[in-house]
Amino acid sequence: MGIMELFSPIAIAVLGSCVLFLFSRLKNLLGPPCIQGWIPWIGAGLEFGKAPLEFIEKARIKYGPVFTIFAMGNRMTFVSEEEGINVLLKSEHVDFESAVQSPVYHTAWIPKNVFSALHERLYALMKGKMGTFNTHHFTGPLTEELHEQLEGLGTHGTMDLNDFVRYLLYPATLNTLFKKGLFLTDKRTIKEFYQQFKTYDEGFEYGSQLPEWLLRNWSKSKRWLLALFEKNIGNIKAHGSAGHSGTLLQAILEVVETETRQYSPNYGLVVLWAALANAPPIAFWTLGYILSHPDIHRTVLESISSVFGTAGKDKIKVSEDDLKKLLIIKWCILESVRLRAPGVITRKVVKPVKILNHTVPSGDLLMLSPFWLHRNPKYFPEPESFKPERWKEANLDKYIFLDYFMAFGGGKFQCPGRWFALLEIQLCIILVLYKYECSLLDPLPKQSSRHLVGVPQPAGKCRIEYKQRA
């Protein structure tokens, strides 16, 4: 082989590398400031993964309102001011579906083609079933389910607050949206289900990005839950009938099976996670904030007593009119969600977009952090304070939140179950504080800074002591 023959492939490789390097540098020059580390593919992932919430805010302070983080093979461009927010929520060049296809595949094994075929139809179905015109159908069943769980707590006790709200909301939600007694048939199966779902939920964010062989316990729990759905699909479909007598999951499966029967268990798992992952932590933070603020706690108790009386032994019914008289509780829930909002919402850039003086290239994940947006004093004065009264300014009668409140997403694809979640947490707070005298035995912990997806969990334990009112 001649020296020129040897030189040619080497030269081509070197020139190709130079072109790629120069292209990436040009991309970075035109685009926002980029934090990318030095390790291929991983990028800034090691530092970012330690405490992503803190990393995002430090980057914003250093680089300004638009910046990019390269981590785990992804370019994530964050925005924090009006122009960037408007692009994320309104631009035709960014897409929600493209942003979540890969995480949905990794966490539930739903292929992209199946997800694309069903996504808009299922979103419209859930939005209708759990929207403002239909939530009143859930008030009675949820109240009955919560009463049943409260009976099981007895007259007094001490529990971790997180376990307390899970004990109440997991069965109430499953029995209302899925099928009564579907999974939770006895103490052994209840304990196993709780443990498997907890493992799946806690590893969900990592499972959406990392190879499964790195997450063996999470992978086992995912397979266990999928097998549980596969075993019970027939029972779920046989429950109820068309219309409001059928459950939400039954209606979802009817739509899924117009496209495929193979992935019915997978969609069951997605709905399970969506139903159980965020409402319990919102209830945790709401009860925690109320009990940590004596004046607000007293106001809430006085409001409940003014509607239902002071005794705590009666099995009360809660009507739509009652809920309207107890706006203070909805304010407390929304203020808790404001303070403990998800770390990010995201869209995929499908065509380059201009934000301020930067061009964000196609392929980037465009991201906004509701957690930090809600701490901007320009939008929320005294942002770190728990001030339920700020929600007087929201037009909740017309289902309109405060400006720049993004806890449930924004734009076309907001959380379709947000009104159901608010309802079940309202009912939970009312029934707990009506029946029991409650107090916290530990300071309310800070939020975990390790996760960005969904409502943050507490970073530590917090016990609640409860005693039935005389």
From Swiss-Prot:
Cofactors named for this entry: heme
GO molecular function, one term: 24S-hydroxycholesterol 7-alpha-hydroxylase activity
InterPro entries assigned to the protein according to its UniProt record, in alphabetical order: CYP450_sterol_14alpha_dmase, Cyt_P450, Cyt_P450_CYP7A1-type, Cyt_P450_E_grp-IV, Cyt_P450_sf
Taxonomic lineage: Eukaryota, Metazoa, Chordata, Craniata, Vertebrata
SUPFAM superfamilies: Cytochrome P450 (SSF48264)
Pathway: Steroid metabolism; cholesterol degradation; Lipid metabolism; bile acid biosynthesis
Alphabetic keyword roster: Bile acid catabolism, Endoplasmic reticulum, Heme, Iron, Lipid degradation, Lipid metabolism, Membrane, Metal-binding, Microsome, Monooxygenase, Oxidoreductase, Steroid metabolism, Transmembrane, Transmembrane helix
PANTHER family: 24-HYDROXYCHOLESTEROL 7-ALPHA-HYDROXYLASE, CYTOCHROME P450 FAMILY 7
Binding site for heme: 415
Topology class, membrane: Multi-pass membrane protein
Top EC class, one word: oxidoreductase
Membrane-traversing stretches: 3-23, 270-290
Localisation: Endoplasmic reticulum membrane; Microsome membrane
UniProt tissue specificity: Liver specific. Hepatic expression is sexually dimorphic (female > male).
Pfam name, any one: p450
Known role: A cytochrome P450 monooxygenase involved in neural cholesterol clearance through bile acid synthesis. Catalyzes 7-alpha hydroxylation of (24S)-hydroxycholesterol, a neural oxysterol that is metabolized to bile acids in the liver. Mechanistically, uses molecular oxygen inserting one oxygen atom into a substrate, and reducing the second into a water molecule, with two electrons provided by NADPH via cytochrome P450 reductase (CPR; NADPH-ferrihemoprotein reductase).
EC number assigned by the record: 1.14.14.26
Catalytic activity: (24S)-hydroxycholesterol + reduced [NADPH--hemoprotein reductase] + O2 = (24S)-7alpha-dihydroxycholesterol + oxidized [NADPH--hemoprotein reductase] + H2O + H(+)
Family: Belongs to the cytochrome P450 family.
Source organism per UniProt: Mus musculus (Mouse)
Gene Ontology annotations of biological process type: bile acid biosynthetic process; bile acid catabolic process; cholesterol catabolic process; digestion
UniProt gene name: Cyp39a1
Gene Ontology cellular-component annotations: endoplasmic reticulum membrane; intracellular membrane-bounded organelle
Protein name: 24-hydroxycholesterol 7-alpha-hydroxylase
